[in-house]
Amino acid sequence: MADVRYYGTGRRKHSVARVHLVAGDGKVVVNGRDISEYFGHETLIMMAKSPLVLTETEGKYDVIVNVNGGGYTGQAGAIRHGVSRALLQADPEFRPSLKEKGFLTRDARMKERKKYGLKAARRAPQFSKR
């Protein structure tokens, strides 16, 4: 019998995470490396694992993630979104708690574009009175 896999796609900023949940002992593998090796900061690891902690499924599933694009914060957010969606496939009863914490909502905030005549999105060149 084939092992049951639950799949979820997560996005944040420019990052896209493809997440697979497989019944296991709680290993989290990101791009072929352990999560603590991939993300140096404990806050990013906690962010990525937060849906598992919330639903108390941390030791029940192995999480296999393929993530690309963006920086580490965006990738951690994308993983959180993807894990939440995959958990929803595994058990639809997780929806209220995940929705309450906002883990199912795609964070639509993106980097604001640079405008011509300005140095950055909103930063204007230095003003000189005379």
UniProtKB/Swiss-Prot annotation:
SUPFAM superfamilies: Ribosomal protein S5 domain 2-like (SSF54211). GO terms for cellular component: cytosolic small ribosomal subunit. Keywords: Ribonucleoprotein, Ribosomal protein. Coiled coil: none annotated. The keyword Glycosyltransferase does not apply. GO terms for molecular function: RNA binding; structural constituent of ribosome. The keyword Ribosomal protein applies. One of its GO terms (biological process) is translation. Signal peptide: none annotated. Pfam families: Ribosomal_S9. PANTHER family: RIBOSOMAL PROTEIN S9, SMALL RIBOSOMAL SUBUNIT PROTEIN US9M. Belongs to the universal ribosomal protein uS9 family. This is Small ribosomal subunit protein uS9. It comes from Exiguobacterium sp. (strain ATCC BAA-1283 / AT1b). The gene is rpsI.
